[in-house]
Amino acid sequence: MQKNIRNFSIIAHIDHGKSTLADRLLHLTGALSDREMKEQFLDKMELEREKGITIKLKPVRLNYRARDGQEYILNLIDTPGHVDFSYEVSRSLAACEGALLVVDASQGIEAQTLANVYMAMDLDLEIIGVVNKIDLPGAEPEVVKQEMENVLGLDQDEVLPISAKLGTGVEDVLEAIVERIPPPSGDKEAALKALIFDSYFDPYKGAISYIRVVEGELRQGDMIRMMSSGKEYEVDEIGVLSPYMTEVEVLSSGEVGYVAAGMKNVNDTRVGDTITGARRAAPEALSGYQEVKPMVYCGLYPLENSEFERLRDALDRLKLNDASLFYEPDNSDALGFGFRCGFLGLLHLEIVKERLEREYDLSLLATAPSVIYRVLLTDGSELMVQNPTHWPPPQKIDRVMEPYVKASIMVPNDYVGTIMELCQEKRGSFITMEYLTSHRVVINYRLPLAEILYDFFDALKSRTRGYASLDYEFHGFDTSDLIKLDIMLNGEVVDALSFIVHEDKAYYRARAIVNKLRKIIPRQMYEVAIQAAIGNRILARENIKAMRKDVLAKCYGGDITRKKKLLEKQKEGKKRMKQIGRVEVPKDAFMTVLDIEND
C-alpha cells in the first residue's frame, strides 16, 4: 500500500497556471465529474477566485491507474505562490516527497519561484520541471527549458511541455509523478508521528487539522497528544479529501488526511505541531517548524464602536485558519477601541481585512502599516516598538534599528538602470547582479522593509511594464536615522496619524500629508490649523478657513457700530467653539498617510 502513495505539491509563480493544472489533474483522475469541474476548484475562498491567487492550502487525494496497470494514491498538497505566504509553502513542502515546478512558457522563471525551489531543494524533494502554456502565441518552451537547466540544474530533456488549459501533456505529468517521486518512507509499526500542515474551524466539529502521517497509524477513537502543548484529545473522526471530506477507519504512515478531535480552540492545533499517541508517544517531535513572526503591523478599528466585540470574535475565528495572524486590543483617542494586528506582509494584511469585511460583515478602518523597530535607549535598555504611539521621546533615544530585507529582483536587462534607480531612492544598497540568460538579470539589493511596504511593488511593475518580479527575505536589523512625525489638528496630536519616517524624507512627507489633509478634512465653523511636527519643531502647516455665516444679512444700511457689535459677537463665538470643539476627521484621512507616495 505505502509503496503506491505519492505526496507532491506544485510550485509556481502567481499566474503561471498552477490552479488550472490542479483542476486538470482532478478531472483526469476522476476526482471531479464534468459537471463539478469549475475554475480553480481548490481555491475555495471567493477572494482567491477573484484575485486569482491561492491563499489557503487544500490537500486533495487522487486515485490514478498508471500505465503499468497499478493503482496509485496521489496526494496533492497545494501551495500559495505569493511571497507573503512563504511559511505556508514550507509547511506544504515538508509534507511531500516531490514537487512539480510549473513555469510559464512565455514568462520564464520568476523570483518567487526561485525562492520556493531552493526551499524544496533544502528539504531534499524530487523536482519535476513542467513548462506550461505552450499553446500561447508568445510561448518559447525551448528557451524556458534551457533557462531551467542553467538556473536550477534540472535536465532540460526531462522537463515536460504541457498546456493545462487544453489538457495537452497532463497525462505525462501524472506518469512522471508515479515514476520519479519516491514513495513515503516511514514505519507503520512505529509510534504515531503526524505533522499538522494546516487547520481550520468547523462550527460543528471544532478545529480540524490537515495532517500528513509520517510514522505509525491513527484510528478513530485513539487518544492523541499535541507535542508542543502536551494536551490530549480523543479522535472523533478521521478521513481523506478526495476532494470532498470522506471518512476512513485508519490513516497510516505516508497518508495525508484530516483529523477532528473536538478541539474547541484553534490555538490547540498549531500549524507545524506534531501529533503523537497519548498512550505510546514518539520520543521527539518533527523538526523544521518555527513560530511565524509578523513583519508588518497595523491598527484595525470598527467604524462603529459597538462592533468591537464582533471584531474580536471574527479575529478569533480567522486566527483558527491563519496561524500567522497576530492581534492584541488597542485603544486610540481618535479611533476608539480596536486591535493592533501583525501580518506576514501587505498582501496578507489586505486579505485579512477583506475577509473580515466580507465573511463577517464588518466595516473597518485600517491605519497606515508599520514595521517593528528596535529602539536602544540612553539608559542601556531596549524597546521593540511596532506602534508609533509608543515611540519614546527623542531625548531618551540612543539609536534606532529597523528591519532590512534582501530583495531579489528579476528583470529583462533593458530595465536594469531604472530598477537600480528605484532601489537607490528607497535607501537600498547594492549586493550583486547576475545574468540568468543573455536578456534576463537577477539584481540583489538590501532594502529597509519599511520602504518596500508602501508602493515598492507597484513602482517596480510600472517602471518595467510589468516584467519585474520580486522576492525578499528578512535580513536582520540595522541602525537608521528615524524619527517620529506627529500630525496635529489645532495643537492636538492625532495619534492614529503619527508615523515613523527617515530624517531625509521627513520634510517632504510632512508637506505632502498636510496638503492632503487640508483637502480631505471638511471646513468647520472655526479655523483649523493642520501641523506636522517632530517633537516641538513644526515642519509644515496649513489652515482650513472657517465657514462663515453672514451675520450682517439683516442690517440694511444704517449704523456701523451695530455691524461691528454683531461681527465681534461672531468672533467671540468662534473662539469659544474652537476651545471646546473637536475636529471631525473623516475616516479616509487615515489612509492618506499611505497614499502620499503615489502622488
Swiss-Prot record:
List the catalysed reactions: GTP + H2O = GDP + phosphate + H(+)
- Kindly give the membrane topology term recorded for this protein: Peripheral membrane protein
Which E.C. number(s) belong to this protein?
3.6.5.n1
User: What keywords tag this UniProt record?
Assistant: Cell membrane, GTP-binding, Hydrolase, Membrane, Nucleotide-binding, Protein biosynthesis
**Which parts of the sequence belong to the tr-type G domain?**
3-185
The keyword Glycosyltransferase appears for this protein:
no
Q: Which domain of life is it from?
A: Bacteria
> Which GO CC terms are listed, alphabetically?
plasma membrane
Q: What is the protein name for this chain?
A: Elongation factor 4
Q: Report the function annotation for this chain.
A: Required for accurate and efficient protein synthesis under certain stress conditions. May act as a fidelity factor of the translation reaction, by catalyzing a one-codon backward translocation of tRNAs on improperly translocated ribosomes. Back-translocation proceeds from a post-translocation (POST) complex to a pre-translocation (PRE) complex, thus giving elongation factor G a second chance to translocate the tRNAs correctly. Binds to ribosomes in a GTP-dependent manner.
On whether Protein biosynthesis is a keyword of this UniProt record, the answer is yes
GO MF terms here are: GTP binding; GTPase activity; ribosome binding; translation elongation factor activity
Cellular location(s): Cell membrane
Picking any one GO biological process from the record gives:
positive regulation of translation
| A UniProt-annotated Pfam family | GTP_EFTU
Binding of GTP: at which residues? Answer: D15, H16, G17, K18, S19, T20, N132, K133, I134, D135
Give the first-level EC class, as a single word.
hydrolase
Stated family = Belongs to the TRAFAC class translation factor GTPase superfamily. Classic translation factor GTPase family. LepA subfamily.
